[in-house]
């Protein structure tokens, strides 16, 4: 799995996440509906989701072609934290 490629989807992801049914946080490992996201951070590239459970900007959506599983999230967490 390409954890670097998957990580790229955690930035400026508002338009993508608004179309998703599920997303996940690779910091706290929660899998949830993007409708639960209450905070977005703006930067030069767009709006980035902030996890409602842990406050980190480590959210990726289900359509990125990587599995939304606890195992994948744990490996993402190990790579980036």
Residue ranges: model-predicted function:
Residues 26-34, 42-43:
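RING/U-box catalytic core of ubiquitin/SUMO E3 ligases
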Residues 25-28, 51-54:
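Short cysteine-rich clusters marking metal-coordination/redox-active sites
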Residues 2-20:
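N-terminal first-folded block
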Residues 71-81:
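N-terminal, charge-rich interaction modules
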Residues 56-69:
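Short metal-binding segments enriched for Cys and/or His
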Residues 34-38, 60-61:
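Short, non-ligating residues that shape and space the ligands of small metal-coordination modules
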């Amino acid at each position: 799995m390409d954890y670097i490629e998957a990580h790229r989807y955690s930035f400026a992801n508002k338009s993508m996440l608004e179309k998703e049914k599920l997303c996940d946080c690779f910091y706290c490992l929660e899998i949830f509906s993007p409708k639960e996201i209450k905070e977005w951070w703006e930067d030069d590239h767009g709006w980035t989701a902030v996890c409602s459970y842990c406050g980190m900007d480590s959210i990726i959506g289900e359509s990125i072609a990587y599995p939304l599983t606890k195992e994948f999230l744990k490996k993402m967490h190990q790579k980036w934290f």
